[in-house]
């Protein structure tokens, strides 16, 4: 059976290290690199649809849920310049047809009425309302055009849990086949997020393998503040140390544990300081042998990655901020406190260019440059 392999974690927590390790194992490389597949957990994605249809649903709420789902899925297919989109390329041309089939399977009635959500006036509707009024006046109130709406087809869906999960599982299976699961293993970065993992047994069979990677929150903070923000990338965490600490504790505390055998929890630091034992865990989880790890340390090299740990040791500023964070996040801290000869001071790393989980140093024009690979 081919596998769906999903590296996931918290921004800057090291899940790309797993993607790199998988690339070293026969038959496990990622066709789409670090492209993030979001159709399950994005706003108005499959999981939002689940929550709307199975919790607090009613006759008109389901109509909004189905239309919002289809609208977002269509944007993922067709919207230009949206980096999470382009599903016609990353998934396949049949993706939106699968979405339509999924919604059709969930819809039990298409009544001939409308509700206030469909009357939320936009620019197109305003023009149509003006035309409607003019026609009504010119015909001496004899001709009344159809009242404009945001959309005209009302869809009702009040599924049981079994009906919803069965339809959703068929939909996801179709998407996976569109990507190529029938031919080979597929690696889908961030298909699931840590906060969604309690749901996986409702949607997937034994073909799923999720690698949930966490990391010392002090290093997550330093990486986000001094790498991502310096590159003008969106940073999802606060960059004030105390605010980050409270945010991170609440974020992790809000997670519902999954307990699924389809999920392997990994600590980024273990992949480095306890490499051999971590690899044995990964082999067992994947059902592969060590011999199938045919190119070890060619994509992920713990000897290099160690420089990307214990970052608070790089300078006094990092150390002060890490000291503020530590009391709030004791249960998430790394157990490793030594073994690092040199860590990265991101303030003096001028050419930070890509998602970084390990580093190499290169000489360029006689000066030392940090290159992130």
Annotate each predicted stretch with a short phrase.
Residues 50-61, 231-241, 312-320:
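A polyampholytic, Gly/Pro-enriched intrinsically disordered region
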Residues 108-293, 362, 366-372:
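PAPS-dependent sulfotransferase catalytic domain
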Residues 47-51, 72-76, 227-234, 250-260, ...:
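Noncatalytic linker/hinge segments flanking ATPase motor cores
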Residues 1-162, 302:
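PAPS-dependent sulfotransferase catalytic core
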Residues 60, 80, 106-113, 141, ...:
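Short secondary-structure junctions and interdomain/linker hinges
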Residues 32-35, 214, 293-299:
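A generic structural motif
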Residues 41-47, 223-226, 277-279, 307-309:
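Short aromatic-enriched loop/helix-cap "lid" or pocket-rim segments at secondary-structure transitions
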Residues 1-5, 114, 135, 252-262, ...:
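PAPS-dependent sulfotransferases, especially Golgi type II membrane carbohydrate sulfotransferases
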